Amino acid sequence: MRTSKSLSSIVLSLCALVLSAGCALAQSPGPQPLPMPAPIAAPRDIPYLAAIRLNVDATDVERHIFRVRETIPVRAGEPLVLLYPQWLPGNHSPSGPIDKLAGLMIHANGARVEWVRDPVDVFAFHVAVPAGATSLDVDFQFVSPVETPEGRVVMTPDMLNLQWSAVTLYPAGYFARQITIEPTVRLPDGWQFATALETASTNGVLTTFKPASLDTLVDSPIFAGRYFTRLDLDPGGVAPVHLDIIADRADLLEVKPEQLEAHRALVQQAYKLYGSHHYNHYDILLALTDHMGGIGLEHHQSSENGTVPTYFTEWDKNADARDLLPHEFTHSWNGKFRRPADLWTPNFNVPMRDSLLWVYEGQTQYWGFVLAARAGLLTRQETLDALASTAAAYDHHVGREWRALQDTTNDPIAAMRRPLPWRSWERSEDCYSEGQLTWLDADTLIREKSGDRRSLDDFAKAFFGINDGSFVPSTYLFEDVVKALNSVVPYDWETFLRARLDGHGLGAPLDGVTRGGYRLVYTETPSDYFKSSESRRKVTDLTYSLGVVIAAEGRLNDVLWEGPAYKKGLTVGTQIIAVNGAAFDIDRLKRAIKDAKQNASAIELLVKNGDRFRTVALDYHDGLRYPHLERDGSMPARLDQILTARK
């Protein structure tokens, strides 16, 4: 009893000390935070007052300027908040180019109305609507990038990419689907265009589209250009599908019959996979250009695709560009129709959450390559070589040691595709390609456990193929993915997925390659696909030997964490000046790597970083190494079955 009484006294004394300390802290000198301003009105699922008229003049192609006028219905005397789209679908991030909005001026009944930017949310503009005003005239410019360092170039003297999210201000407080827009665009004389929007009328260079919800408008960009062609990819099909091409020159639009057939086969193979479609019509927008910025961005009834100018005219040299269209087309099912519940938002200024991108992007990456092979856009060997490159890359990325695959779904928000000094350690949007390997693992496991009677094709049809013809988004949770997998083959799919999403094991998840009947190997000769990738990126990729990727003038644009070059202190931006005492060139460096395999001498490099020169000795003796997949005859050739066209 005495001991207890003593302990109680101590506890009471400690409590008194804590309370007195709390009082002292509460009374301490120093600044206190100001209260935050009232939050922007949350979106409600009710219709906006009336349609907003949106007029875009896209004729100033020399200066890359889009000129915008909106007429927005308002309630007289009531405050209004206008939002510039911030969280952009498909970007999975707050990437709206608010810095490119300029010249914002608002008028009511001909009189200037001042606006004030929100002190916390820079994408929001407060407007005091005058008494007696029933609408506001809102004028501004989208001063799009002139050069790549400013952002993606979307307008050139020969083509443009109009993304409506860049040229729209809209009222806060409403779901995007409840705001109606009446859009009009003025294009340069003689240009042609394509979009998923439906045309109401055309008067010379001025086109008026049928009214659309803000949701649909933002989901329906325009590609327009001086050199344009349109190809029917599904003549007589259930819903029109077209390939709409703009190019830097007219000769780049030449498409051979077999190339057209491969793109038509893409549509048919997608229908065989999913057993449905989720659009009234679909436009694959394709820009073949060195001047407008590249892109791959999904929409429900269209996709934006920008790739090398010689996509068709030098077909055999561009294998690594031919999975782009299948990837973006697949998103009509996976990403636009079936959408993660935490990624869907009611308007474009509510934050997205990206936790299920390993389905949205990872499985799309998987089906993109599979459909490319089944359609004949890629040969089986090219597809295997592409998979070898992916498997090797992730087998050498040691960042998994500290950062799980699940966390890379946050990368679009955290990094927003900014350059990384140590990508193999920091990790990037690995939910795409490591996600692809995870879904290959799942596909081959389903095949193995079902005696090769079921496959991930069955999951795709059951999960993405529902509600044929509907393009109202159908959201899902992690549990829904697990349930759908169990409907194909009963298994502990939750543990399977969480182990791969949350694990920190060394090396890439290569069980799918092994179960698919192949093994990852390295030889001294690169595949044609690997060489095509090097050529398009304008680099020499020595990742699997010296641990570097070398760009023009011997400058390193990637260094593998814990690789030979890393261990000698080389970094991105380092320039190789000399190899073994002779002036640098790529062939000389490759010869030195080969020679070092035959002797004990180190490879000596004179390097420059900034204004500092030094000599490093790379003690590397394993020769040139390039990834390939080699057939393992002890396992069924499931990968070959996966890549075979469906009848």
Residue ranges and their predicted role:
Residues 70, 232-357, 363, 367:
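Juxtacatalytic substrate-recognition/specificity segment
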Residues 27-61:
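N-terminal, polar/Ser/Thr-rich
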Residues 51-57, 75, 85-87:
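N-terminal-proximal low-complexity accessory segments that begin disordered
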Residues 67-69, 79-84:
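Ligand-binding face of N-terminal immunoglobulin V-set domains in extracellular IgSF glycoproteins
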Residues 368-369, 378-647:
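C-terminal recognition in membrane/secretory proteostasis and scaffolding
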Residues 46-49, 59, 65, 69-71, ...:
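Non-catalytic architectural context of zinc metalloproteases
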Residues 1-7:
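N-terminal secretory signal peptides that target proteins for export/translocation
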Residues 9-22:
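Bacterial N-terminal signal peptides
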